[in-house]
C-alpha cells in the first residue's frame, strides 16, 4: 500500500548559509539520504519561510531533501529585507544553491508562491528539473492578487472585515498600498501590528475547516513580518513579471513531468488557476482534492503530495 502519511521528524545532516547579493545570506539545509535523489522544497509566501515539518513529505531513505529560506524569509538574513528581492533574484538563488551543493538535477516541490517560483525556475532551467510537484497554484496575475486582497471576503467575510478594518476608513479603498506603506515602515510599532493583521487574514483563509493552530503559526513575529512585508512587496510590483508570463512560457517545460495538487475549495489560490495551467502544460497531471482548501497540511492535500513523491521513487531517471 502506498504511503500517504507524513514521515517521522528528522534533523538535517548539514546546514549552512549561502551568500548571494548583499545584504542577503540564505539559510539552507539538507536532510534524509546524502546519496539519495535530490528534491528541493520551495516555500510559499513569498516570505513565509520553511519549517521542520516540510522535511516530512519525503522518504528520508530515498530522497536528499534540500530546503532553504528565500531572501528575507525565515532563518535567512536580514529578515524582511527587500533589497534586490525579486522573482528573478530568487530563481538565480535557487540555481546557485543547486550548483553550490553539487546537484545535477533535482525534483522541484513548491506550493502557493512556491508553485510560482517552481514554475519560474523550471521555465528558466528545465534541464535541471526531474519533475515539478506543485500545490495551490498561483500564477502571479493581477486578478489573483485582487482576489487575495478583496475577493476572499466572499468566502471569509469575517476574516476580511478584520483585515480591512485594521486600516482607517479612509484607507480601505486601497488595501494593498496602504498595508504596504505600513509594512515597509522601519518602526516596529508600525510594521509589526500590520504584519500580524495581514498574516492572520491569510492564515484564517487557508484551511477548509477552522484551524486555530494554523492561524497562530502565522502570527509569530518573524513569520508575520517576513510573510506580510515580502508578500506586499511582490504584490505591489506585480510579482516582478509581465502579466501572464508563467502561463505563456509553459512551453519551455516541454519534456518536464509535472503533478499539480489542488484543493477544490482553495480560497487563497482558487482552483481555476490550476485548471488553466494543466490545460497548457502537456506534461502535467492535475489532481483536484475534493475536500480541501489551500494549506499543504490539509489532510487530503498532504496525502496526495506524499503519494506523489512515493510514485516518483519508482522512476529510474538519472
Question: Can you say where each PLM-predicted feature lies in the sequence?
Answer:
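N-terminal cap/lid segment of alpha/beta-hydrolase-fold proteins
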Residues: 4-26, 231
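A catalytic-pocket lid/entrance helix-loop region that shapes and gates access to the active site
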Residues: 127-179
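Conserved hydrolase catalytic core segment
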Residues: 104-143
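Catalytic active-site module of serine/aspartate enzymes centered on a nucleophile-bearing elbow/loop
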Residues: 284-318
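Conserved alpha/beta-hydrolase "acid-adjacent" motif
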Residues: 242, 267-273
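Conserved acidic catalytic loop of the alpha/beta-hydrolase fold
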Residues: 88-106
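Conserved HGGG/HGGXW glycine-rich cap/lid loop of the alpha/beta-hydrolase fold
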Residues: 19-78
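Short beta-strand/loop motif that positions the catalytic acidic residue
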Residues: 253-254, 260-262
